[in-house]
């Protein structure tokens, strides 16, 4: 997304946050946009609050990704929390969480094989363009891992 669109998104999510401060998705999306705009400290503060107060693992996942990108070892803690919660949610409600869990394992969770399994499950549940795009990204991530393994054995 270009900077102008990110600025507009930040304004919109901040307005939503001010109107309904307890609405976690507005806070989470605002943090995501802030991180993209380089407002890392604000994004981290917002996500830390959400990650400890919400049972939605997306916030811990976003927090882990931003901390990892910043080179902070705390990312492991948040990544572990998100991983455990996604595993629980996929076990009990696969149709609702397979896509989000696959996104996590492609990103902060760094397990493309698990992402591929979940992306395949997601395509079986919902045959949408978004589901197929997620599957394609998971396949590509596994091909990259496979190529690295092959190269290391040369």
Where are these regions (language model features)?
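Structural motif corresponding to the intra-repeat A-B loop/turn of tetratricopeptide repeats
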Residues: 3, 37, 70-72, 108-109, ...
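Residue-level recognition of tetratricopeptide repeat
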Residues: 32, 65, 103-104, 137
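Alpha-helical adaptor scaffolds
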Residues: 80-113, 120
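Structural marker of alpha-solenoid helical repeat scaffolds
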Residues: 19, 52-53, 85, 89, ...
């Amino acid at each position: 997304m270009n900077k102008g669109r990110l600025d507009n998104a930040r304004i919109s999510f901040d307005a939503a946050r001010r109107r309904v401060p307890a609405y976690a998705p507005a806070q989470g999306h605002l943090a995501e946009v802030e991180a993209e705009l380089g407002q890392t400290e604000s994004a981290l503060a917002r996500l830390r609050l959400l990650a400890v107060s919400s049972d939605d693992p997306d916030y811990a996942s976003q927090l882990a990704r931003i901390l990892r990108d910043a080179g902070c070892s705390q990312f492991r803690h948040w990544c572990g929390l998100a991983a455990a919660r996604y595993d629980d949610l996929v076990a009990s409600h696969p149709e609702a969480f397979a896509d989000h869990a696959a996104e996590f394992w492609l990103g902060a969770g760094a397990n493309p094989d698990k992402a591929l399994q979940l992306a395949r499950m997601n395509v079986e549940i919902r045959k949408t363009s978004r589901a197929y795009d997620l599957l394609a990204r998971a396949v590509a991530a596994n091909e990259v891992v496979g190529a690295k393994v092959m190269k290391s054995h040369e």
